[in-house]
From Swiss-Prot:
<feature type="binding site">
    <location>
        <position position="388"/>
    </location>
    <ligand>
        <name>Zn(2+)</name>
    </ligand>
</feature>
<dbReference type="InterPro" id="IPR033728">
    <property type="entry name" value="ThrRS_core"/>
</dbReference>
<comment type="function">
    <text>Catalyzes the attachment of threonine to tRNA(Thr) in a two-step reaction: L-threonine is first activated by ATP to form Thr-AMP and then transferred to the acceptor end of tRNA(Thr). Also edits incorrectly charged L-seryl-tRNA(Thr).</text>
</comment>
<comment type="subunit">
    <text>Homodimer.</text>
</comment>
<keyword id="KW-0436">Ligase</keyword>
<dbReference type="InterPro" id="IPR012675">
    <property type="entry name" value="Beta-grasp_dom_sf"/>
</dbReference>
<feature type="binding site">
    <location>
        <position position="514"/>
    </location>
    <ligand>
        <name>Zn(2+)</name>
    </ligand>
</feature>
<keyword id="KW-0648">Protein biosynthesis</keyword>
<dbReference type="GO" id="GO:0000049">
    <property type="term" value="F:tRNA binding"/>
</dbReference>
<protein>
    <recommendedName>
        <fullName>Threonine--tRNA ligase</fullName>
        <ecNumber>6.1.1.3</ecNumber>
    </recommendedName>
</protein>
<dbReference type="GO" id="GO:0005524">
    <property type="term" value="F:ATP binding"/>
</dbReference>
<dbReference type="InterPro" id="IPR004154">
    <property type="entry name" value="Anticodon-bd"/>
</dbReference>
<dbReference type="InterPro" id="IPR012947">
    <property type="entry name" value="tRNA_SAD"/>
</dbReference>
<dbReference type="Pfam" id="PF00587">
    <property type="entry name" value="tRNA-synt_2b"/>
</dbReference>
<dbReference type="InterPro" id="IPR036621">
    <property type="entry name" value="Anticodon-bd_dom_sf"/>
</dbReference>
<feature type="region of interest" description="Catalytic">
    <location>
        <begin position="246"/>
        <end position="537"/>
    </location>
</feature>
<dbReference type="InterPro" id="IPR006195">
    <property type="entry name" value="aa-tRNA-synth_II"/>
</dbReference>
């Protein structure tokens, strides 16, 4: 008999020879049709068909958990691979991972050996996938030696699989299959193909094998999968709605920003976009001031010795830009924290002045492959709303709780009301002591629990220097965006020998907290554009008011109104072009101005304004002072 301990600490006994599926059907029947895999002791993830072989803490993974979701999507990638090879007998499969960001949730890179495949072929491939689902094949697993695996895939002409096997350090590999078809995979997978009922192929592109342009060009097919048609339909609606809201399209229409061939991945902010950018920065700056943050600025270019000292050289080298100055190596900063730590180290510190909260709108540069650049969402230069807090260890929990409150205050200001929060734990490639990681992770959990905030766990997805809280905001069409983070860092204070003098006169090491709320201003602005569909609330809108003249006779009156609104602190544009008023209105609607003032002779004679709110066709006649008062009230209440 074996003992399995559930998350609620209850212990269940399992007979020898039972599979995890048997266990769930007997002890947790309400999960029978939802279970996709199990996780043992917070680490090992297994198929339901595996036999129980030891005492363990067990979690049942469903689609609603990230690891269950990943299992589902990866199984759908296998479904795609099987369908493709059923239809294209010479096709060679390479890799089919799950992805968080992209035109799908999974993809498979395929060498079609000369066959041309386009989106027009998707219905045919999807029909074959449907057949496999209806057949409801049990998913089987087999462990073989590397030698056996190589011989098997050699017979099939699968050269990419052989190359992958050669790079696997262990002497055994696992193979997963459905019916007679199989693929190299470490798993886990769903129990049977019939579970994968609702899917859609979403995009196609080219990709080099191993992202090396000297290797073969492959065809990358993307897809998504859901447990139900309702969820798939909802997702497809989101995609169609997202196309209308694409920040690249709206940004061009509103003349907010552009990208130039002279600087791919480097945003150019136009006057209207700069207004928006500055509005976000000024708001957060004012909120930081209320909370005792001190703003700093650090250099963009710093010695490579600094990056070696901080650990970024070893952990981030491939994403950095380098230059030579006076025959020494320098780098554009990919992160702001080392420079901030130099400022901390510049002075002696007493426990009386801690916690010390530094804030920086720091511009950073990170090298991204050209193929992954995507508007403001994936760029090579961006500005982080960074904060670095240095505190005694016993202040860690209270500081984290204050940051949690701060973060939600900011998000609610922008109209976000639904959130998902995660704790990302220690990755394989990390620095620091085990006890520090355990303490920091425990503190993050306790902070969220005391605030009554539910959270999920992202195993192994923390930063190399410490665990973190990730804040995800849900936008107006139901998409989740990961934005803010709170990261605990014991490593950098150690590396930079940071200290403070405690009440007993002894030197102590502070803990360092990295905090960002927007994440990056560029990406957050992209999210806001799509969330609001460019229809920004008045307080941040770059196009608050547009004044449109009906005839030339009212030009002087319009200029007088324009000057009064400018003097009152509003963002206003004056359109006195010799165009029909209908054309001017259409242009203003495209610019998504909050208010249109349509001024004709009647308004001039009565010293009033014909006001049209965004999204409405009716106009209201207001006095000039009444309109200004309304605007001021609207901004105050936002």
């Amino acid at each position: 008999m074996y003992q399995l301990t559930l998350p609620d600490k209850s212990i269940k006994e399992v007979a020898s020879g039972f599979t995890y599926r048997d266990f769930i059907e007997k002890e947790l029947p309400f999960l029978k049709n939802k279970a996709l895999a199990v996780r043992l002791n917070g680490e090992e993830i297994l198929d339901l068909s595996r036999t129980v072989e030891k005492n363990s803490n067990i979690e049942v993974l469903t689609y609603s958990e990230k690891l269950g979701w990943e299992t589902f999507q990866h199984s759908a990638a296998h479904l795609l691979g099987m369908a493709v090879q059923n239809l294209y007998k010479n096709a060679n499969l390479t890799v089919g991972p799950v992805i968080d960001n992209g035109p799908g949730f999974f993809y498979y890179d395929i060498d079609f050996q000369g066959a041309i495949v386009t989106p027009e072929d998707f219905p045919k491939i999807e029909a074959e996938m449907e057949k496999i689902v209806k057949a409801d094949h049990p998913v089987w697993r087999k462990v073989v030696s590397k030698k056996q695996a190589i011989e098997t895939f050699q017979k099939l002409g699968e050269k990419y699989k052989i190359e992958i096997i050669d790079g696997i350090p262990s002497e055994e590999v696992s193979i997963y299959g459905m019916g007679e078809w199989f693929d190299l995979c470490r798993g886990p997978h769903v129990p049977n193909s019939g579970i994968l009922k609702s899917f859609k192929l979403t995009a196609i592109s080219g990709a080099y094998w191993k992202a090396d342009k000297n290797n073969s060009m492959l065809t990358r097919i993307y897809g998504v999968a859901f447990p139900t048609k309702k969820e798939l339909d909802q997702y497809l609606f989101q995609i169609e709605e997202a196309k209308k809201r694409d920040h690249r399209k709206i940004g061009k229409e509103m003349d907010l920003f552009s990208f130039q061939k002279e600087g791919p991945g480097f945003p150019f902010w136009h006057p209207k976009g700069t207004i928006l950018w500055n509005s976000l920065a000024e708001y957060l700056r004012s909120e930081c001031n209320k909370r005792g943050y001190q703003e700093i600025k650090t250099p963009a270019v710093l010695s490579s010795e600094l990056w070696k000292k901080s650990g970024h050289w070893d952990n981030f080298h491939e994403n950095m830009y380098f230059t030579d100055i006076d025959e020494e190596d320098y780098a554009l900063k990919p992160m702001n924290c080392p420079g901030c730590s130099l400022i901390y180290k510049h002075h002696l510190h007493s426990y009386r002045e801690l916690p010390l909260r530094f804030a920086e709108f720091g511009s950073v540069h990170r090298h991204e492959l050209h193929g992954v650049l995507h508007g403001l969402f994936r760029v090579r230069a961006f500005t982080q709303d960074d904060s670095h807090i240095y505190a005694p260890l016993d202040y860690l929990e209270s500081e984290v709780m204050d940051i949690i409150d701060f973060t939600f205050t900011v998000y609610k200001k922008f109209g976000f009301s639904e959130f998902k929060t995660f704790i990302a734990t220690r990755p394989e490639k990390s620095q620091g002591k085990d006890e520090d990681w355990e303490f920091a992770t425990s503190t993050l959990k306790q902070s969220l629990e005391k605030k009554g905030i539910p959270y999920g766990i992202k195993e192994g997805e923390g930063a190399f220097y410490g665990p973190k809280i990730e804040f995800n905001i849900k936008d107006s069409i139901g998409r989740l965006w990961q934005c803010g983070t709170i990261q605990v860092d014991f490593s950098m204070p150690e590396r930079f020998d940071l200290d403070y003098t405690d009440s007993d006169g002894q030197k102590k090491r502070p803990v360092m907290i990295h905090r960002a709320i927007y994440g990056s201003l560029e990406r957050f602005i992209g999210i806001l554009i799509e969330h609001y569909e460019g229809k920004f609330p008045l307080w941040i809108s770059p196009n608050q008011i547009r004044i449109l003249t009906v005839t030339e006779k009212v030009t002087d009156y319009a200029k007088n109104v324009y000057r009064e609104l400018l003097d009152s602190g509003f963002r206003v544009e004056l359109d006195t072009r010799n165009e029909k008023i209908g054309a001017k209105i259409r242009d203003s609607i495209l610019k998504k101005a909050n208010y249109l003032l349509i001024l004709g002779e009647k308004e001039m004679e009565s010293n009033t304004l014909a006001v049209r709110m965004r999204g409405q066709e009716d106009t209201k006649i207001l006095t000039r002072t009444g309109f200004i008062s309304n605007l001021q009230d609207e901004i105050k209440s936002s």
